[in-house]
Amino acid sequence: AIDPARLSVTVYKDDDEAAKIWNEKIGIPTSRISRLEEDENFWPASAPSQGPDGVCGPCSEIYYQLDSGKTVEIWNLVFTQFNRVGDPPDNLRPLPSKNIDTGMG
């Protein structure tokens, strides 16, 4: 079984909804929720500022701490909710239908 006390997560820096769900619904303490920049927690990386144009969204990643203290990514979620069109500002257009793309590691 996976020990929940060994889990930590990352969210995109502005994704208050994901952080709240991890904390309030799943029970991950805020001390184990890291908010990262778009180069780390947005798909494709740095899409808001650098592109490419197309479907994109913030990410959340789940990590497990091994006995050695090392952490490994065990799962990721991409909240596909925008279409990037052109350069900032105002270049992220909400998609009419949003989805969550998930994957292991």
Where is each model-derived feature located?
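Structured aminoacyl-transfer and RNA-binding surfaces used for tRNA recognition/handling
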Residues: A1-M104
